[in-house]
Amino acid sequence: MKLNRIFPILTACALFILPSCLGGNENPSDYSEWRVLNQNYYDSIEIATIDGILQYIPITPVWDNSFTVLMHWHNDPEENTSAITPLSTSTCHVKYTLTNIVGDTLDSSDSFQCVPNNMVTGFMAAITNMRVNDTVTAVIPYTAGYGAYGYSSIPPYTTLIFGIRLDSISKLM
C-alpha cells in the first residue's frame, strides 16, 4: 500500500529532476554565464595593446555595420598590397583553425574551399578583408557567428577565434 503512494511521488520527481541532469536543454538563457565570459573576452581583445598599439584592427563591414570583427595580421599587410582580395562570391582556398575563448579547438582544415557569403557573416567579413597569402587571427563576436542558438557542438553565444591563411582564390566572381 505504501508503495502505491510513493510511486507517483517518485515519478513526479523524476519528471522534474531527470531532464535537468541530462543537459539536453538548449535554451539560450541557460548560457548567461558563457555569454558574459565571451563578451568580456571580446571586449578585452578589442582594447589589447602592446606599447600603446592596438593588437587587433576592428573591421566593420560596409554591408552590415551591426558587428565588428577584430583582426590581427601575422604578416605585414603593407608588403602584400599587390595580391588580390576575394569578393563575397569568390571561391577561396584557406587553411583555418577555429577555437573558442578557452582554447578548445572546435574545427580545423589544412585545405578548405569556401565561398565567403556561404559562411557565417564574421568569417565572410574577415576573408574579404584579406589578400592572398595573408595569415590572420580573426575574433568574431557571437552575433556574427552562430548567434544565440549555437551550431552542432558550438554552444550559443560563443566568440569564434579563427586562425586563417588565405592560400588562393580560384574564382574571383
Predicted regions and their residues:
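Cross-family detector of peptidyl-prolyl cis-trans isomerase
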Residues: 2-3, 21-173
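Sec-dependent bacterial lipoprotein signal peptides
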Residues: 1-21
